[in-house]
Amino acid sequence: MSVEVMRSVIEAAEGRVPVDTLFTNAQIVDVYGQRVAPGSVAVKDGVIVGVLYDGRDDAAGTYEATEVVDCQGRYLAPGFIDGHLHIESSNIRPAEYARMVATRGTTTAIADSHEIANVAGLDGLRFMIEDGRRAPISIKYMMPSCVPALPDEQAGAVITAADMQAFFAEHPGDVFGLGEMMNLPGVFMADPETCARIDAANQTPSKQVDGHAPLVAGMDLNAYAAAGIIADHESTIPEEALDKLSRGMYVMLREGTCSHDLANLSPMLLENPARARRCCFATDDRAPSDALSTGMIDNACRVAIEAGIDPVVAISMASLSTAEAFGLDHGCRDPHELRGAIAPGKRADLLLLDDLTFAKAPHRVYAAGALVAQDGTFVGEIAPEMAEVAALADELRASVKLPKLSLDVFDYAFKPGEAVIDVVPGKAITGMARPESAEGLRRIMLIERHGRGVSLQAEGADGDGPAGLGLVGKHIGRGWVRGFTITGGAIASTIGHDSHNVCVVGDNAADMMAAVEAVGQGGHVLVRDGEVVARIPLALGGLMSEGTAEDVAAQHDDFMVKARAMGIEPPLDPIMGIIFLPLPVIPTLRIRPEGMFDVTTFTYAD
């Protein structure tokens, strides 16, 4: 904080100059004092400069203000901070994402854009940063730490420690910290490149490294925490979360679209509520239809409260705990950077709530003192797209480069006892089965789409055989999945975490081929009897739509109806279900372009 800014804040805090906005008759959610108390809050230049509690501070008088907002007894809470998320998973660009989440009370998003980085490298990250600048809420971008997710993954880019350091030097302050460290073997083995990437975080404003450690325990967890990784959002049972808390890590309780872990983890907090101070919320991956209908971090608060967690504690986890995890809550710094509580010297990110049930969107949402949403409607401003953003967006189009494929590639037999992915609905983890028959199974394929297969095919990989058959086991993985009950057709997507190759699941070869052909330049496609019955176009990198959140939500809802009619039953989400099946950093069995991969042993499974 400069001396000039400090003096300005002090003058306003002392009441010697008028403030911009004074919130009166509020029930203030005090996350420091863990209480709700009546009072008023003064804001000047986007910063909270004064908090006066009724009774205790009556002798202090009040603030002169340009605008007085009578809260009429409503609750005034700090804006929510989403501790870990992937904007691309909502299938919309950053400015549109900000418009969507602001209506639900998210005023800060800690975004890891490793999805677009796996497709377009650092140019993809630059697009996210520049497009995000158009938004009134605060988006803090983390540098993707694992592009690709594993060293030999067939992604569209590679980002090394040296690349990170060069980007930090060229774009100082644009990247907040280092994103989730998914290369667990690299950490455990003290791999020099992995360690260099972790060390690169020291060039960022937060100097923090986010984590990703599903089922990690014992000495491996000790090594992970000792490396300086501050948080994890992958815990699925209380014992796992407590292991991480006890090693000094923050635990993010995830409540997304595919993964619903919060209720399962809540017993750890009910057993000892003091643990909540080191716990926060993350959505990770959230579909627009869910965001618009049930919310984002406000939804996590509701789930927590329904599980028995005190509302003030839930709000604290949604704000202060996350701010503390990333060092955003204290220090003699620019007050526009400090947040997580209603207290002097903090950014004026505020929620005006009718009650503390979170059954609906906040009555009003303020970001840096400016009204951005009211009763679920965005009323803020999104800046126009400038030439640089438009140019970066244009580079993300036409990202799907698939080889030529014949029907023979999709038509293969089941081998009794072979490794089969066992879907776990509502969870990112999968199981591994070895059934003796194909009853109840569906074919699954992963086709590299970043140009490797195209190049190898041009070199004669297929020989005189059917198109694409020479790529099987190299750039086309084939296998079987149980629990993905699509009937009479196929589903395909250009989203396949984290390298985003084309994944297709179906019960017959012809529809699987038709679905892959229909993917075009990106999106989700549902094919039945050779016809496309539902589609969500994702032109930007094959990950993001150029439409609104409402457009994508409507397409998603139609897709869901058609998918349910084809036998994909709840609780399995057909889209979130398929896009995580290739993810090679979460146990147990996954599909890669080379074949079926056992994450627990890091070997290919026959």
Per-range role (PLM):
Residues 86-88, 114-116, 144-149, 180-185, ...:
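Active-site beta-loop-alpha junctions enriched in small/polar residues
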Residues 14-16, 34-35, 61-63, 132-133, ...:
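Solvent-exposed alpha-helices and their adjacent loops that cap or buttress functional pockets
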Residues 157-179, 186-253, 260-281, 292-306, ...:
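Histidine/acidic residue-rich metal-binding segments in metalloenzymes
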Residues 1-39, 44, 103, 292-308, ...:
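Active-site microenvironment of metallo-dependent hydrolases
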Residues 2-4, 9-12, 95-206, 533-535:
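Divalent-metal coordination cores built from histidine and acidic residues
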Residues 53, 120-124, 150-157, 189-193, ...:
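Short acidic, glycine/serine/threonine-rich loops at helix termini
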